[in-house]
Curated annotation (Swiss-Prot):
Biological or metabolic pathway of the protein: Carbohydrate metabolism; tricarboxylic acid cycle; isocitrate from oxaloacetate: step 1/2
Secretion signal span: none
One of the GO BP terms on file: tricarboxylic acid cycle
Pfam families in the record: Citrate_synt
Record: active site: 309, 366
Keyword Ubl conjugation found: yes
Crosslinked positions (Isoglutamyl lysine isopeptide (Lys-Gln) (interchain with Q-Cter in protein Pup)): 328
Family: Belongs to the citrate synthase family.
GO cellular component, one term: cytosol
Protein source organism: Mycobacterium tuberculosis (strain ATCC 25618 / H37Rv)
Miscellaneous note of the record: Citrate synthase is found in nearly all cells capable of oxidative metabolism.
Protein name per its UniProtKB record: Citrate synthase 1
Length: 431
């Protein structure tokens, strides 16, 4: 990205100001607003930050109109087809695809840090068995700050690297233990001869008294889903990680904040909502055309889940990949074909209906992922946990990029105050 002498002129009551244009290598250029308040007395008002770039980033590029998603320049379809999740982790965090030796060293370092401190394992005892796994995940990740105090300084590159490896290694273990806690099953120790995804599946579904062998197709399907979720530039949870980290909070605490943001139903919980919608269509006995009619009737209060996106105004490129994978996995594992059939029929109906076409409502990545997760054996409450596992390398990459900039500032948004002007205090007996 090159900063030049190009400017944009902003006119306001009482004057005008020239603001520097910040050029992107692809996509929208930005207008630097740094001097705006000091020179004009005005600030910008952008609810939801839909038009605000809070950072320069070289990690992920999205063209929502064209349906393009690239990690470090590589198209998502190529990575999903040819790469692995561990390789994509390396790519996002370090900027380039690893060679054979680099990948082996990276994998080996992660494998040596998969276990949790024995005292930390007792942390899970403090949660009720019916606790949702997301607050468990967030709390235990934050608690890593107390158990691994030798790697908390965000300005020490060696400590940042160690905390990076620890998070990549331990989050799958924490996620699996959160699941085991919810079903009353014993924890397993990690098996460092396995890949990251194989280890996670064994920790989640295995038992101490019997061997566990993950189906290679299941491993590949979950690995691919993690790749698709690995980053999506400045979304709510990633922006949260950056904002928390801007105060120089350590990486563990910053990632915990991102997990909390992801738990919100408007962010990470959409795939569960899609599954519930499909089940509702099936159980109601209505056909898809009747459901579509209700969606189009605002007074009916029926929502179409898994369609539309804050960024994409075209078909989400991840959704095409997930749809193909859903066919394969459900055919192999004998998942609920009725729900897949409803999903396909609903997609076809929406893509050919002017109501949805005019509103640019296309399937997003959440539309089919819930079907795959359930076919793999995960309960719906684990869906957002799986999202977090996939998104972790993106969060880490953005946190590190922010600190590597050198001139980063603590995040501190402005506001437009709409409250009372000054008034005098009145004692309680006079109110």
């Amino acid at each position: 990205m090159a900063d030049t002498d190009d400017t944009a002129t902003l006119r306001y009551p009482g004057g005008e100001i020239d603001l520097q244009i910040v050029h992107a290598t692809e996509g929208a250029d930005g207008i630097a607003l740094g001097p705006l308040l000091a020179k004009t007395g005005h600030t910008t008002f952008d609810v939801g930050f839909a038009n605000t770039a809070a950072a320069k980033s070289s990690i992920t590029y999205i063209d929502g109109d064209a349906g393009i998603l690239r990690y470090r320049g590589y198209p998502i379809d190529q990575l999903a087809e040819k790469s692995t999740f561990i390789e994509v982790c390396y790519l996002l965090i370090y900027g380039e695809l690893p060679d054979t030796d680099q990948l082996a060293q990276f994998t080996g370092r992660i494998q040596r840090h998969t276990m949790l401190h024995e005292d930390l394992k007792r942390f899970f005892d403090g949660f009720p068995r019916n606790a949702h796994p997301m607050p468990v995940l967030s709390s235990v990740v934050n608690a890593l700050s107390a158990y691994y105090q030798d790697a908390l300084d965000p300005m020490d590159n060696g400590q940042v690297e160690l905390s990076t490896i620890r998070l990549l290694a331990k989050l799958p273990t924490i996620a699996a233990y959160a699941y085991k806690k919810s079903v009353g099953q014993p924890f397993l120790y990690p098996d460092n001869s396995l890949t990251l995804v194989e280890n996670f599946l064994r920790l989640t579904f295995g038992f101490p008294a019997e061997p566990y062998q993950a189906d290679p197709e299941v491993v590949r399907a979950l690995d691919m889903l993690f790749i698709l979720h690995a980053d999506h530039e400045q979304n709510c949870s990633t922006s949260t990680v950056r904002l928390v980290g801007s105060s120089r909070a350590n990486l563990f605490t910053s990632i915990s904040g991102g997990i909390n943001a992801l738990w919100g139903p408007l962010h990470g919980g959409a795939n569960q909502a899609v599954l519930e919608m499909l089940e509702g269509i099936r159980d109601s006995g209505d056909d898809v055309s009747e459901f579509v009619r209700k969606v189009k009737n605002r007074e009916a209060g029926v929502k179409l889940m898994g369609f539309g996106h804050r960024v994409y105004k075209n078909y989400d490129p991840r959704a095409r990949i997930v749809k193909e994978q859903a066919d394969k996995i459900l055919a192999k594992l004998g998942g609920d074909d009725s729900l897949l059939g409803i999903a396909k029929e609903l997609e076809e109906a929406a893509l050919t209906d002017d109501y949805f076409i005019e509103r640019k409502l296309y399937p997003n990545v959440d539309f089919y992922t819930g079907l795959i997760y359930r076919a793999l054996g995960f309960p719906t409450r684990m869906f957002t946990v799986l999202f977090a596992l996939g998104r972790l390398p993106g969060w880490i990459a953005h946190w590190r990029e922010m600190h590597d900039e050198g001139d980063s500032k603590i995040g501190r948004p402005r506001q437009i105050y709409t409250g009372y002007t000054e008034r005098d205090y009145v004692t309680i007996d006079a109110r």
